[in-house]
Amino acid sequence: MKSTNFKKTFTYSRRSFVGAAAASAFSFSFLPSRVFGANQRLQVAGIGVGGKGKGDFDGLAMHGDVIAACDVDARRLDVSVRKHPDAVKFSDFREMISQMGDKIDVMNVSTADHTHAPAAMMGMRWGIHVYVQKPLTHTVWEARQLATIAREEKICTQMGNQGTASDGLREGAEFIRAGGLGKVKEIHAWTNRPVWPQAPTVIERPAEVMAVPDHLDWNSFIGPAPMRPYHSSYTPFKWRGWWDYGTGALGDMACHTTNLAFMGCELTQPTTVESVNTGPINAETFPSWASVNLDFPKTDKRGPIKFYWYEG
């Protein structure tokens, strides 16, 4: 149970997503830390509780009492909270945190990629511990901001990655670090994705205008992205292929297929990153395929490594 008595009320304009989430994120550092008694249970909330988020939410719920849940899709939200009849339901994470942030101890963020950072930022500035589904953020800048906030707030954070959570991957990384593969000089990783619509079949926004389904909070799905009319080509799931919402095959799968190599070879920052080949580029969706080369410098533990990524 949370020890703070602070309560904050916020009002939002329809399109003040970035200002509301980011500004509030950088304004709440005065909130006190939690103090737990021996018999107190964690107060749990979820943002994005359908699809993969349902697994994250259910796992988190095993460690405490669910008091709030948020999803832009009311149908998925209703399914996910059936086991938690006392949970307060929201379609807008800003409303959930502003109304219940002083009660929430820990939450998952498992939304579309482009709203990972705004939701996590706001929660972290309230002192809420967060589990954010991969990829961590939509941009590198956002990831750096989350790292800064985590240090300042001294809270627990984790990026969700199923493979990394398994003993097999961690043991494999230990094997590589112990020299089991000898001197690693090259790494090749790949994925058959995309398995969702994007280039070359989808390169423009749909011209058709659809009515927003009654169960969908379209404004909250759009979040910090530029507003556009609703179409079923965007959600659920299909947002992965759109620049405004997803991170393409690289963001969706590289967290999985490259992580063993990154952990085992202790890779950090590359010295060069080169897109050596790709399908045609357009302004709306990711290319149908790509090849990317990365160079990692030598360290006191190993020599330089050339990393090759293939998708499509």
Task: Provide a role label for each language-model segment.
Residues 55-60, 79-82, 117-122, 142-143, ...:
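Short, solvent-exposed loop/turn and secondary-structure capping segments
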Residues 41-42, 64-66, 85-86, 102-106, ...:
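Loop/turn elements at helix/coil->beta-strand transitions in domains of secreted/extracellular proteins
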Residues 129-131, 137-220:
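A contiguous active-site-proximal alpha/beta segment in oxidoreductase catalytic domains
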Residues 20-84, 163-166, 176, 261:
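N-terminal Rossmann-like dinucleotide-binding module
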Residues 3-24:
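N-terminal secretory signal peptides and thylakoid transit peptides that target proteins
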Residues 171, 183, 188-194, 198-312:
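Contiguous beta-strand/loop segments that form the cofactor/metal-binding neighborhood of enzyme cores
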Residues 87-145:
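Beta-loop-alpha module in the N-terminal Rossmann-like domain of NAD(P)-dependent dehydrogenases
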Residues 43-47, 67-71, 108-109, 131-132, ...:
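Structural recognition of the beta-strand scaffold that forms the well-ordered cores
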